[in-house]
Amino acid sequence: MQNTDTTKYIIHSKINADGVIERPDIVGAIFGQTEGLLGADLDLRDLQKTGRIGRIEVMVTAKGGKTKGNIFVPSSLDKVETSILAASLETIDRVGPCSAKIEVFQVEDVRAVKRKKIIERAKLIFTKMFDETVPESQELADEVRQSVRVDELTYYGKSRIPCGPNVLNSDAIIILEGRADILNLLRYGIKNTICVGGTNIPPEVAELTKKKTVTAFTDGDRGGELIIRELLQVADIDYVARAPDGKCVEDLVQKEIIRALRRKVPVEQIIEKYGIQERENEDSACRLERVSKRKIRAPEIVPRIAEKKLHKRVKVHRVSPKADIHEEEFPEEMEETGPERAPEKIFEKVTERIPERPAEKTSAAAERVEARTSVAKPAVMARAVPATRVTRGKAAAEKGPAVKVPGGEAVRVSPAPARQAPAPVSPEAIRFRPHVDALKGTLTARILDSDDKVIEEIAVRDLASRLKNYRDNVKSVVFDGVITQRLVDIASSNEIKNLIGVKIGNIAKVPADMEVLTSSML
């Protein structure tokens, strides 16, 4: 084949002849029968002289008085001219004395084959030659960074425990599992670290935790959990941070390390989770002292606000020195103190005696004072006992005579109750308490209709998937589990009005037409 360097296409054709013919007969027939057929520009002899087509290859075999074979015509013409040339071969109908038929079945693109070879060779060159001879810039940076980290790594105590250079000078330290974890944090500039080398906590580390604010940062696997359990028993730690599930601290990148340390939780929150009791020795006393500083004394805020508001109350005088009266103006903040504290705040000592007056002479001002009377509202969804109310009209007149305060307004008085009335049973408790008691500790759920009749009783683990496919008259769900935002959303989509569980989880929003209750509220 000639001019293989310039060949673009190869025309593949097959020939069938009724007789015995040889290669020279076929080549002569091709040149002879196509001469002048396509014009001077596409004459095969001229194209072969100029190198536009290559050497015509013929491979034939004769058997049983017939000849079969293949013809290959290389071409450096473009696609259009090559197609015309291939079609002209099919016009040959005789080779020598025999009738013959030529059929083109493929036009091979030689450049595509070359491209495949180039790709395969490039893969081989890339994998075999570059890995060992040309280091990447990242490898150079890692090598320099590794040398710096090794120089910064120091040791603590007689046991030469690996640690960062700032462990002794820093007020807060991070306890890690091993030396590789320290090197990884040094890579990102965190130098106040020390390792414990497994679940056997060194005494030097346990002693160091008494003097500093300590964060335990462990792997997100079973081993990390065991180290935390050991630290809770022998050391004095303040916070706990965990790597993502299934990951090690030594494999974390900078973003994951910062995110995990920001999500650290106080040790008090995980003591109950791991079932560890605090030690009753001096170490525990130190921890409890620090804990008390971190606790937010939210319960102290509400009484302080209520005390300030009590100075603004209206002073009401009583008829006799032994009778107390209901206060006629309540601060709004009394809602937060709870209904059981409200009766203590709504009575005032009498400072002077006022003679009795008939109830018939009650002025219009007294009626206005009664109209403005407010009552303490319960803090949790109207489930608690309501505070004592000051009634209007005739009922108020029956309780006691009207008296006049120094400001000139008349109010009605009544003796203080000897003790608080018993708490009434809420309708929800009557409806759902039997179901709650029956399901306690069973990890099952009951789906109720509008008449509070049980439609179906299933396991809690199947409740979410079952509610998604439920289309019956479901109005309430009572189950022995935690109420989550996912369950609230599913119940809202099915127009369920009541959702009762053991306790409420992290819920961001609850529909206005849905009651979310716990067994303690009932």
Swiss-Prot record:
SUPFAM superfamilies: DNA primase core (SSF56731). It catalyses: ssDNA + n NTP = ssDNA/pppN(pN)n-1 hybrid + (n-1) diphosphate. Mg(2+) 1 binds at residues 177, 219. GO terms for cellular component: cytoplasm; DNA-directed RNA polymerase complex; exosome (RNase complex); primosome complex. It comes from the Archaea. NCBIfam families: PRK04031.1-1. RNA polymerase that catalyzes the synthesis of short RNA molecules used as primers for DNA polymerase during DNA replication. Also part of the exosome, which is a complex involved in RNA degradation. Acts as a poly(A)-binding protein that enhances the interaction between heteromeric, adenine-rich transcripts and the exosome. Belongs to the archaeal DnaG primase family. This is DNA primase DnaG. It comes from Methanosarcina mazei (strain ATCC BAA-159 / DSM 3647 / Goe1 / Go1 / JCM 11833 / OCM 88). The gene is dnaG.
